[in-house]
Amino acid sequence: MGNPLILIEIHNRAGLIRFNRPQQLNALNGAVMEELAAAAESFDKDDAVGAIVITGDERAFAAGADIKEMADASSVDMLLADRISKWDRLRKVKKPVIAAVSGFCLGGGCELAMACDMIVASETAKFGQPEINLGVMPGAGGTQRLTRAVGKAIAMEVVLNGRTLSADEAYRFGLVNRVVPVEQYLNEALKLANEIAARAPLAVRLAKEAVNNAFESFLA
C-alpha cells in the first residue's frame, strides 16, 4: 500500500490538509484533488473546526498539474475525470480556507492557492502560471483571479511570458497576505486560522460569502 496522497490534522480549531507527494513536488492529479475536496468538505461540516489550512512542504506547495497523468490520459479520460467539479467543491466550502505556501506554487498549484481565501507565504515561495510553456493557457479561474489580484500588466507578463513572482513581489502586488521566514510559514497560517476560528462562525461565513460575491461576480 502506497503513502497517502494527503495528510489531515487538527490544530486547535484549524483543520490542516497537507499534500503528501514530495517526490512529485506535490503535483496535482485527479486523485489528489478528489481527496482534497473530500477533506475540505469534511472539515466544513465539523463544528470543532473554524478554518482550514492547505499546505504542501518547504520545497513545494504544488508545482502544477501532474503532467504524467495528463500525458497518459485520452481526451475521453480527461472529460470523464470532471476536474472542474472538484475545484467547484472546494470553492463552495463555507469556512475560510488559507493556503500556506513555500517553494514552488505553479500552474494548478498557483490556481489552487488563489482559489483559497488568503495566502501566507514563506520567503522561498515562487508563484507562476507557466502553462504557456506547454502550449496551453491557465484554467480553473487562474487568469481572472490573478488579474484581479495583481492587475492587468503583471498578469499579462505572468500568463503570456511565464514570469515567476518571488514571495516579496507577490506581496507587493497584492497576491499574498503575509511573507514570513520559511520555518514560520505553516505556524503563521495556523495562527491566522485559529484567530479567525475564534470569531462568531455565522458572521465569518457570511462575511466570506459577501467578499467572494463581490470578487467573483464576473468569474465563470
Name the predicted role of every residue range.
Residues 91-204, 208:
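Crotonase-fold acyl-CoA enzyme core
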Residues 17, 21, 35-36, 54, ...:
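Terminal peptide-recognition signature
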Residues 1-57:
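Conserved CoA-thioester-binding segment of acyl-CoA-metabolizing enzymes
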Residues 34-37, 45-48, 56-92, 105, ...:
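Glycine- (often His-adjacent) and acidic-residue-rich active-site loop
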Residues 177, 215-220:
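Short, intrinsically disordered, charge-balanced linker/junction segments flanking boundaries
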